Curated annotation (Swiss-Prot):
Function: May be involved in growth and differentiation of hematopoietic cells.
Recorded family membership: Belongs to the protein-tyrosine phosphatase family. Non-receptor class 4 subfamily.
Gene3D superfamilies, A to Z: Protein tyrosine phosphatase superfamily
Entry annotation: catalytic residues: C229 (phosphocysteine intermediate)
GO cellular component, one term: nucleus
Top EC class of this enzyme: hydrolase
Highest classification ranks of the organism: Eukaryota, Metazoa, Chordata, Craniata, Vertebrata
Name of the coding gene: Ptpn18
Protein name per UniProt: Tyrosine-protein phosphatase non-receptor type 18
Length: 453
């Protein structure tokens, strides 16, 4: 058995030996990552002077996610026309130490030109997008791509849509033609349509498909992968980390001391809050376990019990709280890491089905779990608004028109709503479905059922 196979097997066995199913070790690891990140900022190891300058602050989507000076992407294209060198983006090193990834935020209306300056100057061929334009009624990313029969113009750049296809239920692939000073280039964009902010997808399958497809489109030529979500940290960090580990597997360069903790820690030195929440950190472990499991099955056919041994790791250690259950689309077996089996997707979370009801005076998040409603339960209130079905602001252009949408090169920030505080995304309070409902106080008469003897 090769040394590479031994290292892969050792990592999987280590997960079981350390009893990751309890989750305590992963929680401690992620707390350590956050603590070190805070220390780096306070000690000046990771400075943000450029992004904090007066002329650049309105180019940051979120006030607390600012590009690190040491690894920030510096724009030189079109500087002679008065455009600055700052964009909220950082380089992340690949397995060979090169600038393999550009982690950036979703463009703002007044940074669309800067985004396309970045794509053109650094020869980006593939863009991975892990968010939607609008999520939960809030604008997360300005549309920087063209629609069918609707070209987009950003300064001197003209973008047209060549082709749009749906790879599966989660991923849309667009091929764009970008024109700048009479030169044409093709840029591919992969958009993951259903990854919740601060959360995780319902399975690893389509994430692995997205990363694999990106590498097929990228080919062996130069140029970094451009990866973004809304802030360019949480979901972006997961994608970069998954591709990084996958490259280690494909090149058989897993180091003897391989550690996902160290992988994420190193990425956080290059991009703020990469892999932003503990849930995303668990999902990363879950996905990497699937990658390692598949690799070991391909290279060691006699290790038949691996899948059974790793099933608890995938099912329990990395229990994923998601906002929706999406069916996984199986892919035909082929080369290494092309078909990854994952646990069945979880059922819809209670928060998406029932209204938030909290008993007065009870601590948030207490109780063993929700009580399922029965057919005999009497509704207490006449109208309940499900939490997951918030109104969504539709800001897209009308269909059926063919026009160039011109984006001004410079534009002031759109106001306070352009910024949002980015937290760790953890649930600070439970829903308390198991709690009984007390009598409502007020002028309303209680339901008749309460007065029956």
């Amino acid at each position: 058995m090769s040394r590479h196979t031994d290292l892969v097997r050792s990592f999987l066995e280590q997960l079981e030996a350390r009893d990751y199913r309890e989750g305590a070790i992963l929680a401690r690891e992620f707390s350590d990552i956050k603590a070190r990140s805070v220390a780096w900022k306070s000690e000046g190891v990771c400075s943000t002077k450029a992004g904090s300058r007066l002329g650049n602050t309105n180019k940051n989507r979120y006030k607390d996610v600012v590009a690190y000076d040491e690894t920030r992407v510096i724009l030189s294209l079109l500087q002679e026309e008065g455009h600055g060198d700052y964009i909220n983006a950082n380089f992340i090193r690949g397995i060979d130490g090169s600038q393999a990834y550009i982690a950036t935020q979703g463009p703002l209306p007044h940074t669309l030109l800067d985004f396309w300056r970045l794509v053109w100057e650094f020869g980006v061929k593939v863009i991975l997008m892990a968010c939607q334009e609008t999520e939960n009624g809030r604008r997360k990313c300005e549309r920087y791509w063209a629609r069918e029969q609707e070209p987009l113009k950003a300064g001197p750049f003209c973008i047209t849509l060549t082709k749009e296809t749906t790879l599966n239920a989660d991923i849309t692939l667009r091929t764009l033609q970008v024109t700048f000073q009479k030169e044409f280039r093709s840029v591919h964009q992969l958009q993951y349509m259903s990854w919740p902010d601060h959360g995780v997808p319902s399975s690893s399958d389509h994430i692995l498909t997205m990363v694999e497809e990106a590498r097929c489109l990228q080919g062996l030529g130069p140029g970094p992968l451009c990866v973004h979500c809304s802030a360019g940290c949480g979901r972006t960090g997961v994608l970069c980390a998954v591709d990084y580990v996958r490259q280690l597997l494909l090149t058989q360069t897993i180091p003897p001391n391989f550690s996902l903790f160290q992988v994420v820690l190193e990425m956080r030195k290059q991009r703020p809050a990469a892999v932003q929440t503990e849930e995303q950190y668990r999902f990363l472990y879950h996905t990497v376990a699937q990658l390692f499991s598949r690799t070991l099955q391909d290279t060691s056919p006699h290790y038949q019990n691996l899948k059974e041994n790793c099933a608890p790791i995938c099912k329990e250690a990395f229990s994923l709280r998601t906002s929706s259950a999406l069916p996984a689309t199986s892919r035909p077996p082929g080369g290494v890491l092309r078909s990854i089996s994952v646990p069945a997707p979880p059922t819809l979370p209670m928060a998406d089905t029932y209204a938030v009801v909290q008993k007065r005076g009870a601590s948030a998040g207490t109780g063993p779990g929700p009580r399922a409603p029965t057919s005999t339960d009497t509704p207490i209130y006449s109208q309940v608004a499900p939490r997951a079905q918030r109104p969504v602001a539709h800001t897209e252009d009308a269909q059926g028109t063919t026009a160039l949408r011109r984006v001004p090169a410079d534009q002031n920030s759109s106001g306070p709503d352009a910024y949002e505080e980015v937290t760790d995304g953890a649930q600070t309070g439970g829903l308390g479905f198991n709690l009984r409902i007390g009598r409502p106080k007020g002028p309303r008469d209680p339901p008749a059922e309460w007065t029956r003897v």
